């Protein structure tokens, strides 16, 4: 089975109820050659699901707690995301790792909880600029893969997103050879355990570079940040993926 193509939009801490009007345009203009996912802030998740009304657009969370319930003020359980209509959840994003001190073990525990709740876990990995400059990119990502993917992961319930930290929201992107090298390493590292897992690239993906990025071997889609907030910016990326 070939990996599924996925265009995933991460709205981060952006958007409000009025912004849900963008979803109408995304639903109306989306291509059928790939899956399309939007991960809004938690307060918009259920309103977004309700607005779609059972359409083909997928909706996901941006994080979940490793516990199923309990005294964890401000946190969200994976089962609560699923109950609200989510199909996916982003885990281990570099902003969570940096801002909240999340470790690989934390990410693995959250992914296990996501799988238990029936969610697809999008597990993020990526190197900092210092690690890239030091020539340790592949070692860093190999360690993140080993530590962040739980033993219950399968190609069906897991997606891997490679996001070089220094490229997120900066307008900078690695060159094609750098992206290809990392994606080939990830594919090889997971060939025995997750042979058909989808591998996404993230980091300043936009309409202008999407076609070129999707032509790279082992790139099955994208995790898109700012360019997913407006349908006019996101739909060309979706179209490029569907055509790849």
Identify the residue ranges that each predicted region occupies.
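Active-site loop-to-helix "anion-binding N-cap" substructures in soluble metabolic enzymes
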Residues: 1-244
């Amino acid at each position: 089975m070939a990996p599924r193509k996925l265009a995933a939009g991460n709205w981060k801490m952006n958007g409000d109820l009025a912004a849900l009007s963008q979803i109408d345009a995304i639903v109306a203009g989306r291509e059928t050659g790939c899956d399309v996912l939007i991960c809004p802030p938690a307060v918009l998740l259920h309103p977004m699901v309700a607005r779609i009304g059972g359409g083909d657009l997928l909706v996901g969370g941006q994080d979940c707690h490793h516990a199923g319930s309990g005294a964890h003020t401000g946190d969200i359980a994976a089962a609560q995301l699923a109950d609200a209509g989510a199909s996916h959840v982003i885990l281990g994003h570099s902003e969570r790792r940096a801002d909240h001190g999340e470790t690989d073990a934390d990410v693995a525990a959250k992914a296990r909880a996501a799988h238990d709740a029936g969610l697809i876990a999008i597990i993020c990995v990526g190197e900092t600029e210092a690690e890239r400059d030091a020539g340790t990119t592949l070692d860093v990502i190999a360690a993140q893969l080993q530590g962040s993917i739980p033993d219950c992961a399968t190609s069906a319930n897991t997606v891997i997103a490679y996001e070089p930290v220094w490229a997120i929201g900066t307008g900078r992107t690695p060159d094609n050879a750098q992206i290809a090298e990392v994606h080939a390493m990830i594919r090889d590292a997971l060939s025995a355990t997750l042979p058909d897992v989808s591998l996404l690239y993230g980091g300043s993906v936009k309409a202008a570079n999407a076609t070129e990025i999707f032509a790279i071997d082992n790139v099955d889609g994208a995790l898109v940040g700012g360019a997913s907030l407006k349908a006019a910016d996101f739909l060309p990326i979706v179209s490029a993926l569907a055509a790849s």
